Amino acid sequence: KIKMATLVSPGILVKERDLTNMVIGESSSDGAIAITAEKGPVEEVVTVSNEVELVEAFGKPNASTFEWFFTAASFLKYAATLRVVRINSGHVNAGVSGTPILVKNSEHWLANFSDGSANVGQWAARTPGTWGNNLKVWQCPSLTVYEQKLAANNRVNGALAEGVTAVVLDNVDENNYAVVVDDIISFTSDAAGATPLAGHEGVEYIVTAVNTGTNTLTVKQHNVFSTKGLAAVVANESYITRRWRWYEQFENAPGTSTSVSNKSGSGDEMHILITDEDGGISGVANTILEKFEGVSKASDAKTESGDNNNYIDVIYNQSSYVYW
């Protein structure tokens, strides 16, 4: 028998204890909370398991939402999951019609807006809140919009000096041959657009303004972080090739899908691109957020693998930012 030592004066007694039979398990507690948030579905339960998922679903905290956010975040520090519902606090979805609308969540969109009968504009932000004001949806519905040789229908009207930013055309809004803001143009010496003007090889210009009264475009060099004007002189009656703003982001111009071609149709494809116009989402203005290549305007169009390729359905199933 082993006797324990007895201390007759102040001192330290060391004892060993085997704790290997104790297992501390992870928390299995679940919680629920209703919050206000800058983004995210309204009146829909979203289950999150950490703060990263909370931010992805409902955005970062701000002056109006921080109390709710940090209450939820604090619970997640010791809980397994948290069910979060965003309160309907008067926000509406950003859209193109100018008429305020509220699309609470996907189920609400399917029941009230998916067939287009609500007639409230072509696009709406995926969830309510001012965050959607940053979004811009770009569409390229045809080969002509993607790229067009203006030929003799709309040429440069008057010689231009190197460095200038004002380009006068015969008619900037010529029917079927117009040039609009954000178009990309280049100058050639031939109507077919095959031969660039001397000094303009590999140089394109983005249109930043259009004056229909004077038929004048304001341009700057494309993909150059400055306001540089023309790289060289431009002769009177030079030819122009016009392209869609984001043409270089897609492999080819939209055409006809195999699905529609097999049914004797044509011209159903379109490209869609979504940008962070103001930089409020990504931190950098005009950042590309999403792009959808060769989606179809035909309601029954299919991809080569048999999936639905109608652009409304593709946007609904794949976009994180908008509804049609």
Region locations from a protein language model:
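N-terminal-proximal low-complexity accessory segments that begin disordered
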Residues: 2-97, 103-107, 117-131, 137-139
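Surface-exposed receptor/substrate recognition regions of extracellular proteins
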Residues: 27, 42-47, 202, 261-284
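Short amphipathic, basic-aromatic surface patches that mediate peripheral association
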Residues: 171-174, 246-262
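Surface-exposed interaction regions enriched in Ser/Thr/Asp/Glu
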Residues: 227-247, 263-265, 271, 278
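E2/UBC-UEV (E2-variant) core
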Residues: 284-324
